[in-house]
């Protein structure tokens, strides 16, 4: 009672002291003027929108209640040019005014302390009208007393004498309850004089003054935000409806209110609120789409109330001034009112309360309400009453801001009676289905926009309506025959409906898809394709939606189908990540300000059911060794991105459960989502994985790449950079170094911090340069400042041990438009082993050798322990804004491919019809109320169509000759819509300004492909299909527009009469070609659209092609390309190629046939596809080149029609392993019979390098390197009689360079090696290459054409104008004046980075001084293959060349390990391939492929000379040191003789199996292109080279060839030797003809001499705390063990009865295992009880495993006393 009395006294005091702004008994009439317009800003001054005018009457009943009425309302639509801006005054005479359809019913304004707290309206007043009333009444909200002021130090408090104020307040208006900056100041007489409309009744100031109140709203800080948004998943700083969105979006609202008299008692003279919304329509547009609104109230009169407004019938509170949601599907007004609203009991029925007692009662009642609401937790972030109810699976969501939902009087358009949503959807589906068959005109029909309209319409449909629509269409895919052309419209109808349902994204749509799958309507790949898109399209993934998805996932029809199970599982987990785990995505991607959080924070299904289910499935797949399913569940768990997954991955990553390296690598790679949601946690785990040097490089490199996504601290980057100098794994070091150096170059804000750190640690990296085949990370960006676009590309790949092809490739690219990221496109390709793929997948059974080869026998004698082939596993993933596709595979799946391909070929033999359509959308929506109470709507939509229809017929022969005939219509179409506008619900209008762009490609082609692989022929024939002679093949357009759209008219905007495209005044059209041709191009755009015309510039086009979205701007453009044929084209375009080769024989290859000068040869047969010409040119190409092999390519292009032409191009060239000579011949002929135009070009060129290939530097010391070449070009109508260009060139080594090279350390080291008898080790190989450097070029050209000379001279003149070139020109006395000759001389400087170039022409002489090679894209490395510090050049030699040398006393392996060598009389395996273990059968060894059965053996005689055996397949080549300077050669036991002029070749079926030839003075060479090996020897030393195909596939004295020199001493037993002599002896063949030291050492070898190779070892990389367990690791660490530290724990207690299980609502203090209670006490605990069902038992089991679920929000079932420990000790 005392409290009540105190409150009464306080309330009375407040009431007595407060002076009301509204004089009781007075009536105020205000003129209401508002306008809301939209336009494209500077792009056009055309605006479209609506103007409203009305009268507002306000009657002051008492200090807390105002009665009001809006009446005499009128509105007019406008769509016109406003050169003076959107505020241009428009007289009523120029407007078509209509009555505003408002009810005109009176309403109440509830006040408190002079501020508007609530609007009381008639319950029957439409919600759209209520929101407009709020926008009007909101103009009267003036807080001059700081009632809602935020108390901060910066507040400026006004006084009566100095009415200056500045403060911030949290204030509600129709746009939301947001922070408002108040500025109050007196209004000067000058301003009033200049703008008298501000003070329409100046006498009202009395003794006071006129004052101006400025309110600026801060939309970044709001307590109640009203908006609907969808589709911005990748943006971290996005807050829809605010200004935190970079240049993409900005929003402002400013109010100017003029009051008279004083701040405590005043009259509002005028109030104007101006609001502006600016959006980049397509995100990257430079011009903004605008929505501009203004609400203006001006006092018209003030008088005593003569006729009081009637009381409000059926009153209802609307909460506050904030926009209010309603149920768009209800027949009555169901509004969502916040808790602050008064209930019906609080709404006093007497509108004329006047007694102070009643006022006090009301104030106390309000005060009580405020006290209770402030202490209540009802309006938590979990649930707010003003939000719409969460969507159900059966019903469409209540989206109260989107056009189709509020477009008809605030209700969904189906309420209009004019739109039957079912029939309208059906009609749209049939329209689209029919238009898909007129693919050429898809842009004209606006088919893609119709599909978007269909999707939006279906989002308003409930489950029953969708079922009725499906039934009405009478389309069942099970009844469709996919190969029946007569059903093409029905097929299109089904695919349109299917894709529309997929894109709809509502609960009813999902139930439809679920039903399709359960009843088998969609199966396998079609169902998988649908499921893969759902996470991208779902609008409201509520807990019930996800629960239903989970039930579908467990359905056998899904789980038993591999492709469907993979797609569904990954989609389910991606949806969980977006909707439940990733807070950024939860907020940015879904309409949380409309429905609140879609999944309750207290929903533990993710932890109790979803993750455990996936964990069980992973464990089951692991037990069954089902690799595709293992990969699926690894990716699925990683896709969730929740820390809980670490506990699932832990046993596998730490080796407690064995997984393959590939699977562990995928597991680490799947942590990418965790790096986004919890970067610190992910960083810790990834860093520990990286530090484990015993882990495989694939796993570690993947960890490195992901680690960079977590923005590691500087100290961590420093550690990693330093560690590159210590880590022995080149793959990992290469990944770290390349990634850090790539990061250094980035400048964009996103990478700025990490780039700065990378630059600071760069100096700590190892200086070693790594090959590009090793693991690398690249990050590239392109910044387009003028378009506010930054494009990013990330490429990571992990190298292979057994191939140059990476095992893992990850590529992603995305663009940032301001701060808005467009969803990225990611591509991932992984394979466990390239060699396994080659061995097990690409080779057919007949290609595998069945007899034991010589190499296998040697491997058996050496008892080589083979490695098991890595099990073949792999996957391919594509993830973009439309779908996520993941295809895991293993050997068993690949084994099925040949059968599948064979079945497909069999199916298309008869040319069956196909019709495949795919429609996809990417959508983003933002909507919120404007300050005029009308919904603002922004949409960004991308609609894409891919279509293939027609027939394919194929015939394939066993010898890979095949014929394919097809009649196909291929279509790709894309429509991008960026639209800004607002909705007027009372007249079902949507006013829009936007930019639409279209890209359309159509190819209706009849194609015939004939490939004859044995003969090397291929021919394409291409015709346009019949009936398509005038078809549109290409369309591109950008159309800015404004539109006054009737929402009930479900037609594309381009077909609306209210749409006005912004065609520029200087628009012009261009048609090409001017004359008739097979194609016609029409271009339409503005003359001033320079960017469009600049695309003709090849350089700018090339620069923009990688980023095609930057090629357009906002200006109008339209490009169409048509076929322009008069009738059916019966003759095809023919493109044919022929390839042939020829092994040249004597006498053609005799050296005397080589001529020092090459002459262009005119073929005797110039017809297309001439075998005679090909043979002639091959013979000429190989003439005079020893052991040459010639090749020829013959191309023919025939174009029929009016401009018939025949083009022939033939190129022939030769190569030789024996001589350093080469020749190239070319013939080009163009014939156009109808125009009698023929043209020919004949080219002949040759090159010769001397000395020829040398291996030993001592052979080179006295020889001068040089290169001679010449080119002969003849051209004209007949090249035999036409003009000629003759070019001769020489490259030489200057004496200066020779002297410089001779003084380098490389040469000196080689000389020292030669003194010890070692002449071919790597040092001397470098010396040979270094000594062959050429630095002088001299070229002379005979040019008879004056035009060509003039053109060349003009080019020189243009070069001279380049700023960074130092050029001197002499035109007065040119050296070649009067001659038809051009000379070019160039000389490199001593550092080989600059050149002096002198050019002499008949017109001028030019001297280019110190030309930097880098300016022209060349580097020193392009000139050299090696370098030395003496030349100031580094890293030119590849340190890991694929060569192995056995020199006089030392050897070097393939991987560069150097060791002393002494062979003795025993044969030793220098290099041999060996069989592998079949991973599917550990007892079986796989045979070595026939073309990889290679062994090289060597031994020494008493003189220290080396005898060598080479076993290539079934051939045996033996090299025996001879009495002369070169070894004797035996092939299969038969002695052969080779000399400088005579080589030996073994040829089978025009293929050289191997050839033997002389190299230099004393070396013999052997090369086999078939086996990819080569050998050079001189009787004392041997050099062996092998291709990358042998990587990690050989053993012997040359090492294991895995590009890692640390393990080169691997012995036959797969262990490592320490001592070189042990390693050498281990490869001795001791079974026969073996004696001496090698035999003794080999026999004495013990097991301890050979160390077993350490296999990969996993370690503890996930701690207890990181896996979510109780941290027990810290308790035993350190010198001072705190055994009691973790004795006290908290555990949820469980009590079980017969029918219930009860859980403590909060964890209870307990003693840990191994600890006991020292002291106890009793304490009451609340329990929540559940029925004993499956859910309760699952929760119990989870608690028993250590979980402590949060049950604090559950209802209390009972309270019991528990005895709990007070102190626990171990």
From Swiss-Prot:
Keywords: Disulfide bond, Glycoprotein, Secreted, Signal, Storage protein. The lineage of its organism: Eukaryota, Metazoa, Ecdysozoa, Arthropoda, Hexapoda. Glycans are attached at residues 296, 1067. The keyword Isomerase does not apply. Its main location: secreted. One of its GO terms (molecular function) is nutrient reservoir activity. It is found in: Secreted. Residues 1-16 form the signal peptide. It comes from the Eukaryota. Residues 22-809 form the Vitellogenin domain. Precursor of the egg-yolk proteins that are sources of nutrients during embryonic development. Involved in the differentiation of honeybee larvae into queens. Pfam families: Vit_open_b-sht, Vitellogenin_N, VWD. Accumulates in the hemolymph. Represents up to 70% of the queen's hemolymph proteins. During the first week of the worker adult life, when it becomes a nurse bee and performs brood-rearing tasks, the vitellogenin titer increases and may account for up to 40% of the total hemolymph proteins. Residues 1442-1635 form the VWFD domain. One of its GO terms (cellular component) is extracellular region. Gene3D superfamilies: Lipovitellin, beta-sheet shell regions, chain A, Lipovitellin-phosvitin complex, chain A, domain 4, Vitellinogen, superhelical. Disulfide bonds join 178-222, 1444-1598, 1466-1634. This is Vitellogenin. Induction: By MRJP1 during the differentiation of honeybee larvae into queens. Residues 373-394 are annotated as: Disordered.
């Amino acid at each position: 009672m005392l409290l009540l009395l105190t409150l009464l006294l306080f309330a009375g005091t407040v009431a007595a002291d407060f002076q009301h702004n509204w004089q009781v008994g007075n009536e105020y009439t205000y003129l209401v003027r508002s306008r809301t317009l939209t336009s494209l800003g500077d792009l056009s001054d055309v605006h479209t929108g609506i103007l409203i005018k009305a009268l507002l009457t306000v009657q002051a009943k008492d200090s807390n209640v105002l009665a009001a009425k809006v009446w005499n309302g009128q509105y007019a639509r406008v769509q016109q040019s406003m050169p003076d801006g959107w505020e241009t005054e428009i007289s009523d005479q120029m407007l078509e005014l209509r009555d505003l359809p408002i009810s005109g019913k009176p309403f109440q304004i509830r006040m408190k302390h002079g501020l508007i707290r609530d609007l009381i309206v008639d319950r029957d007043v439409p919600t759209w009208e209520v929101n407009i009333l709020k926008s009007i009444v909101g103009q009267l909200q003036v807080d001059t007393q700081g009632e809602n002021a935020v108390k901060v130090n910066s507040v400026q408090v006004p006084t009566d004498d100095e009415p200056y104020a500045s403060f911030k307040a949290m204030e509600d208006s129709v746009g939301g309850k947001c922070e408002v900056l108040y500025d109050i100041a007196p209004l000067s007489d000058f301003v009033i004089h200049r703008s008298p409309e501000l003070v329409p009744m100046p006498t009202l100031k009395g003794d006071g003054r006129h004052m101006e109140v400025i309110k600026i709203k801060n939309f970044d800080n709001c307590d109640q935000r009203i908006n609907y948004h969808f589709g911005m998943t990748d943006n971290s700083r996005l807050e829809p409806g605010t200004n935190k969105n970079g240049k993409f979006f900005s929003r402002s609202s400013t109010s100017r209110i003029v009051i008279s008299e004083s701040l405590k008692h005043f009259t509002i003279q005028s109030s104007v609120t101006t609001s502006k919304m600016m959006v980049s329509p397509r995100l990257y547009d430079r011009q903004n789409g605008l929505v501009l609104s203004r609400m203006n109230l001006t006092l018209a009169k003030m008088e005593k109330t003569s006729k009081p407004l009637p009381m409000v019938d059926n009153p209802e509170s609307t909460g506050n001034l904030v926009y209010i949601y309603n149920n768009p599907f209800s027949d009555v007004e169901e509004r969502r009112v916040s808790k602050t609203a008064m209930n019906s009991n609080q709404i006093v029925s007497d509108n004329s309360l006047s007694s102070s007692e009643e006022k006090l009662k009301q104030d106390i009642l309000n005060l009580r309400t405020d006290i209770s609401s402030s202490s209540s937790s009802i309006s938590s972030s979990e649930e707010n009453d003003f939000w719409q109810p969460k969507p159900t699976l059966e019903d469409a969501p209540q989206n109260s801001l989107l056009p189709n939902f509020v477009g008809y009087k605030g209700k969904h358009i189906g309420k209009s009676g004019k739109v039957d949503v079912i029939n309208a959807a059906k009609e749209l589906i049939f329209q689209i289905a029919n238009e898909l068959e007129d693919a050429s005109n898809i842009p004209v029909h606006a088919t893609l926009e119709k599909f978007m309209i269909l999707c939006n319409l279906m989002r308003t449909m409930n489950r029953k309506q969708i079922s009725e629509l499906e039934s009405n269409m009478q389309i069942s895919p099970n009844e469709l025959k996919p190969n029946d052309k007569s059903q093409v419209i029905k097929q299109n109808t089904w695919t349109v409906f299917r894709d529309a349902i997929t894109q709809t994204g509502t609960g009813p749509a999902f139930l439809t898809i679920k039903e399709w799958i359960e009843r088998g309507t969609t199966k396998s790949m079609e169902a998988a394709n649908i499921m893969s898109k759902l996470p991208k399209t779902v609008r409201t993934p509520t807990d019930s939606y996800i629960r239903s998805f989970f039930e579908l996932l467990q359905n056998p029809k899904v789980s038993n189908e591999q492709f469907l199970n993979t797609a569904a599982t990954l989609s389910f987990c991606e949806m969980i990540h977006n909707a439940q785990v990733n807070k950024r995505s939860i907020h940015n991607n879904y309409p949380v300000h409309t429905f609140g959080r879609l999944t309750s924070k207290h929903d533990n299904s993710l932890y109790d059911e979803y993750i455990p289910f996936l964990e069980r499935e992973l464990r089951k797949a692991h037990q069954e060794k089902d690799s595709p399913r293992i990969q699926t569940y690894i990716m699925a768990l990683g896709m969730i991105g929740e820390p809980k997954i670490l506990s699932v991955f832990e046993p596998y990553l730490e080796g407690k459960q064995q997984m393959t390296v590939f699977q562990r690598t995928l597991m680490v790679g799947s942590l990418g989502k965790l790096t986004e949601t919890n970067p610190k946690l992910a960083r810790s785990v990834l860093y520990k994985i990286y530090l484990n040097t015993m882990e495989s490089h694939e796993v570690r490199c993947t960890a490195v790449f992901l680690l960079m996504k977590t923005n590691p601290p500087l100290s961590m980057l420093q550690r990693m950079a330093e560690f590159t100098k210590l880590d022995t794994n080149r793959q990992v070091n290469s990944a770290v170094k390349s990634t850090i150096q790539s990061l250094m170059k980035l400048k964009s804000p996103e990478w700025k911090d990490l780039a700065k750190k990378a630059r600071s640690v760069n100096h700590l990296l190892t200086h070693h340069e790594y090959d590009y085949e090793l693991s690398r990370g690249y990050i590239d960006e392109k910044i387009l400042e003028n378009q506010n676009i930054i494009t990013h590309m990330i490429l990571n790949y992990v190298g292979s041990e057994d191939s140059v092809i990476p095992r893992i490739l990850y590529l992603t690219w995305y663009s940032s438009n301001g701060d808005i990221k467009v969803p990225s496109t990611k591509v991932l390709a992984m394979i466990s082993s390239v060699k396994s793929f080659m061995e097990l997948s690409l080779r057919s059974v007949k290609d595998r050798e069945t007899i034991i080869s010589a190499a296998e026998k040697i491997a058996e004698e050496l008892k080589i322990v083979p490695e098991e082939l890595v099990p073949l596993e792999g996957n391919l993933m594509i993830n973009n804004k439309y779908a996520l596709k993941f295809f895991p595979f293993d050997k068993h799946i690949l084994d099925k491919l040949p059968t599948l391909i064979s079945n497909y070929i069999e199916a298309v033999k008869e040319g069956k019809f196909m019709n495949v359509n795919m429609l996809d959308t990417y959508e983003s929506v933002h909507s919120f109320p404007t300050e005029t109470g009308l919904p603002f709507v922004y949409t960004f939509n991308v609609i894409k169509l891919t279509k293939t229809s027609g027939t394919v017929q194929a015939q394939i022969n066993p010898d890979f000759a095949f014929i394919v005939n097809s009649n196909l219509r291929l279509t790709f179409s894309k429509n991008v819509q960026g639209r800004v506008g607002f909705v007027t619900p009372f007249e079902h209008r949507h006013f829009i300004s936007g930019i639409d762009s279209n890209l359309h490609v159509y190819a209706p082609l009849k194609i015939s492909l004939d490939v004859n692989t044995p003969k090397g022929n291929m021919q394409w024939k291409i015709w346009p299909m019949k009936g398509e002679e005038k078809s549109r093949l290409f369309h591109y357009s950008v159309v800015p527009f404004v539109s006054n759209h009737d929402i009930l008219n479900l037609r594309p905007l381009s077909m609306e009469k209210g749409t006005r495209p912004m065609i520029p005044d200087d628009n012009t059209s261009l048609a090409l070609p001017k004359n008739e041709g097979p194609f016609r191009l029409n271009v339409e755009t503005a003359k001033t659209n320079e960017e469009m015309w600049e695309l003709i510039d090849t350089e700018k086009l090339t620069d923009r092609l990688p980023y095609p979205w930057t090629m357009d701007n906002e200006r109008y453009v339209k490009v169409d390309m048509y076929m322009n044929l008069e009738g059916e084209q019966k003759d095809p375009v023919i493109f044919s190629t022929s390839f042939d080769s020829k092994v040249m024989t004597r006498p053609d290859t005799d050296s005397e046939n080589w001529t020092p000068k090459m002459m262009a040869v005119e073929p005797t047969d110039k017809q297309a596809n001439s075998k005679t010409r090909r043979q002639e040119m091959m013979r000429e190409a190989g003439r005079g080149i020893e052991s040459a092999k010639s090749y020829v390519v013959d191309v023919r292009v025939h174009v029929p029609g009016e401009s018939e032409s025949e083009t022939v191009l033939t190129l022939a060239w030769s190569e030789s392993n024996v001589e350093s000579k080469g020749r190239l011949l070319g013939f080009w002929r163009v014939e156009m019979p109808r125009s009698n135009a023929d043209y020919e070009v004949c080219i002949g060129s040759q090159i010769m390098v001397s000395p020829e290939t040398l291996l030993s530097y001592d052979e080179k010391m006295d020889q001068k390197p040089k290169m001679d070449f010449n080119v002969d070009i003849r051209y004209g109508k007949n090249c035999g009689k036409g003009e000629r260009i003759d070019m001769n060139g020489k490259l030489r080594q200057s004496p200066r360079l020779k002297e410089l090279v001779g003084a380098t350390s490389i040469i000196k080291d080689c000389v020292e090696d030669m003194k010890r008898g070692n002449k071919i080790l790597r040092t001397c190989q470098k010396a040979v290459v270094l000594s062959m450097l050429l630095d002088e070029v001299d070229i002379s050209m005979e040019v008879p054409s004056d035009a060509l000379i003039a053109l060349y001279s003009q080019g020189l003149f243009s070069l001279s104008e380049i700023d960074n070139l130092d050029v001197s020109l002499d035109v007065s006395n040119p050296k070649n004046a009067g001659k038809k000759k051009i000379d070019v001389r160039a000389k490199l400087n001593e550092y080989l980075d600059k050149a002096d170039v002198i050019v002499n022409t008949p017109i001028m002489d030019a001297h280019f001084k110190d030309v930097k090679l880098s300016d022209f894209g060349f580097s020193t490395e392009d000139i050299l293959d090696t370098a030395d510090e003496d030349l100031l050049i580094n890293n030119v030699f590849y340190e890991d060349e694929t060569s192995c040398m056995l020199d006089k006393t030392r050897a070097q392996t393939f991987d560069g390990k150097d060791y002393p060598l002494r062979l003795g009389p025993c044969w030793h395996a220098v290099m041999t391939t060996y069989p592998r273990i079949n991973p599917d059968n550990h007892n079986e060894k796989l045979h070595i492929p026939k073309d990889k059965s290679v062994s090289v053996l060597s031994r020494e005689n008493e003189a220290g000379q080396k005898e060598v055996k080479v076993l290539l397949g079934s051939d045996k080549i033996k090299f025996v040191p001879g009495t002369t300077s070169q070894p004797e050669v035996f092939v299969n036991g038969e002695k052969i003789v080779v000399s400088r002029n005579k080589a030996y070749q073994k040829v089978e079926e025009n293929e050289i199996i191997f050839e033997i030839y002389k190299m230099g003075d004393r070396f013999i060479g052997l090369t086999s292109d078939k086996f990819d090996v080569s050998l050079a020897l001189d009787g004392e030393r041997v050099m062996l080279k092998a291709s990358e195909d042998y990587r990690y596939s050989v053993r012997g004295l040359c090492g294991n060839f895995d590009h890692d020199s640390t393990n080169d001493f691997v012995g036959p037993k797969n262990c490592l030797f320490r001592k070189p002599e042990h390693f050498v002896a281990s490869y001795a063949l001791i079974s026969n003809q073996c004696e001496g030291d090698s035999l003794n050492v080999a026999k004495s070898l013990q097991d301890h001499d050979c160390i077993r190779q350490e296999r990969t070892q996993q370690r503890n990389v996930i701690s207890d705390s990181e896996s979510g367990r109780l941290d027990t690791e810290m308790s035993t660490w350190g010198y001072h063990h705190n055994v009691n530290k973790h004795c006290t724990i908290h555990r949820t207690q469980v009590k079980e009865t017969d029918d219930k299980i009860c859980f403590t609502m909060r964890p209870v203090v307990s003693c840990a295992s191994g600890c006991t209670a020292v002291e106890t006490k009793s304490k009451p605990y609340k329990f929540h009880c559940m029925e004993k069902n499956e859910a309760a038992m699952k929760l119990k089991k989870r608690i028993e495993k250590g979980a402590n679920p949060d049950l604090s929000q559950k209802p209390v079932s009972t309270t019991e006393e528990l005895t709990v420990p007070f102190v626990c000790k171990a």
